[in-house]
């Protein structure tokens, strides 16, 4: 939980703030509900949501790639930078076609797809390098720690929706790659949405769950006021997990539904 919380926070987040977030995630969200295996939502994402609501400025403060971070307690200046999702938000909030085209040019000139794939961009600790996240995905699959259904359905849903909603002046494939590689989508899909405790355990339930959180992420990114929707999409999916398990329940082969007894006690 502590590592995942650090992964979804900016590298300039103060240590004392991380301690507060870790306490809230582990003690309030996990231990008060019975400890390991008893929490019904992802503790790290709830901790991030709490920090974002309480310290919005610090949680949205980014540094550019290659910036020299100050040591603990230092007041050295850090060069601030935007993230791909923050720049992309200008495309959806544009009121005119000219503004949208200007936002597209700003996105493509500021960030390249190759930089986003390798990790030469600003962002939270665990979301900047799509390559590293893909390697982690392959490793977890080979070790049978996670299954493919949730990550593939989650990322695939966002990919399909962004392919069909690309703005004018930008290739649909490029727009899709910016959305897949940008933000915390891959981090959430691989390391957070697959949490055993808070995700469905039925095969069909995992498929429903992945599509659902992919849809919510797309809607928040494109129509909401926030730049990123991964955290809230997964938390909503966590709350829906019992229903996904029920919808994905498979009836055993040969099962016969018991017949009700006739009225009057006669069978």
Where does each model-flagged region fall?
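Structural signature of hydrophobic alpha-helical transmembrane segments
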Residues: 11-21, 116, 120-130, 173-185
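Loop-to-transmembrane alpha-helix initiation sites
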Residues: 40-44, 176-183, 206, 224-237
């Amino acid at each position: 939980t502590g590592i995942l919380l650090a992964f979804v926070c900016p590298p300039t987040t103060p240590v004392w703030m991380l301690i507060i977030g870790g306490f809230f995630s582990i003690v309030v969200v996990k231990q008060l509900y019975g400890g390991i295996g008893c929490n019904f939502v992802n503790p790290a994402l709830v901790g991030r949501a709490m920090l974002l609501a309480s310290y919005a400025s610090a949680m949205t403060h980014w540094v550019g790639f290659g910036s020299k971070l100050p040591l603990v307690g230092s007041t050295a200046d850090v060069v601030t930078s935007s993230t791909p999702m923050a720049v992309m938000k200008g495309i959806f909030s544009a009121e005119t076609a000219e503004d949208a085209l200007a936002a597209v040019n700003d996105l493509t000139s500021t960030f390249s797809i190759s930089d986003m794939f390798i990790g030469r961009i600003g962002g939270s600790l665990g979301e900047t390098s799509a390559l590293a996240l893909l390697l982690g995905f392959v490793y977890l699959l080979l070790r049978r720690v996670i299954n493919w259904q949730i990550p593939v359905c989650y990322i695939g849903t966002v990919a399909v929706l962004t392919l069909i909603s690309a703005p004018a002046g930008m290739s649909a494939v490029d727009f899709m790659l910016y959305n897949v590689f940008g933000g915390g989508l891959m981090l959430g899909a691989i390391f957070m949405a697959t949490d055993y405790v808070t995700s469905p355990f039925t095969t069909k339930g995992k498929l429903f769950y992945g599509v659902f959180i992919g849809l919510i992420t797309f809607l928040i990114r494109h129509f909401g006021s926030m730049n990123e929707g991964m955290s809230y999409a997964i938390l909503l999916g966590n709350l829906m997990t019992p229903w996904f398990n029920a919808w994905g329940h498979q009836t055993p082969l040969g099962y016969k539904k018991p017949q009700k007894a006739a009225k009057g006690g006669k069978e």
